[in-house]
C-alpha cells in the first residue's frame, strides 16, 4: 500500500477515505478595511473564517446614490414583464461583474493558487453581500486580498479588497 518514500500508492480500485482532525481551530477574522473601488462601490471583508479545509469569506458592498442614478438612467427602473409589471433593480443588478470573479492574491497581485478548484470562488452574490469559498492554505502571505484575476499570474489591484490581517 505504501511506496518506498512512505507515501500512499494510488489505489487500483475502490474509494479513498481519510480522517479529518476536527480539533483544529477555526480562526475568525472580522471587520476588514473599507475601500472604495474604481466604480465608486465601497467594499470590505465583513468576516473570514479559516478552517482546516476551507476559507470562507463574506464581503459587504455599498452602491452609491450616484451609481444607482446612473444605472437607472441607462437601464430604466427595473425588469419589465410582458404584462407591464416592473420589478425594480436592486444593488445586485447594479454591481459590476467584478464581484463574481474575485480570487485570493498577495500584495503584488499574484494569485495564491494557479487555478481555483471545483466549488471555489464566488458562492453567491446578493444585494450588498457576496460570499466566497477557497481551499485552506497552510501558510498565507502577510497580507491577502480579494481581487479580480487578469492573467495567469496577475490581478487588478485597483479592485483589491484586503482581508483582515492574519495573525
Predicted regions and their residues:
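Alpha-helical, hydrophobic structural elements that either
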Residues: 1-167
Amino acid at each position: 500500500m505504501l511506496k518506498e518514500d512512505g507515501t500512499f500508492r494510488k489505489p487500483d480500485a475502490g474509494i479513498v477515505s481519510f480522517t479529518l482532525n476536527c480539533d483544529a481551530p477555526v480562526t475568525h477574522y472580522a471587520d476588514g478595511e473599507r475601500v472604495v473601488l474604481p466604480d465608486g462601490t465601497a467594499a470590505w471583508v465583513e468576516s473570514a473564517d479559516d478552517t482546516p479545509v476551507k476559507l470562507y469569506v463574506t464581503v459587504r458592498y455599498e452602491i452609491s446614490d450616484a451609481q444607482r442614478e446612473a444605472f437607472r438612467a441607462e437601464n430604466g427602473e427595473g425588469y419589465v414583464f410582458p404584462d407591464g409589471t416592473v420589478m425594480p433593480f436592486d444593488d445586485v443588478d447594479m454591481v459590476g461583474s467584478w464581484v463574481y470573479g474575485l480570487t485570493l492574491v498577495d500584495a503584488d497581485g499574484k494569485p495564491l493558487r494557479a487555478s481555483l478548484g471545483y466549488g471555489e470562488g464566488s458562492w453567491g452574490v446578493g444585494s450588498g453581500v457576496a460570499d466566497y469559498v477557497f481551499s485552506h492554505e497552510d501558510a498565507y502571505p502577510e497580507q491577502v486580498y480579494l481581487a479580480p484575476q487578469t492573467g495567469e499570474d496577475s490581478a487588478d489591484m485597483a479592485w483589491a479588497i484586503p482581508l483582515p490581517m492574519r495573525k
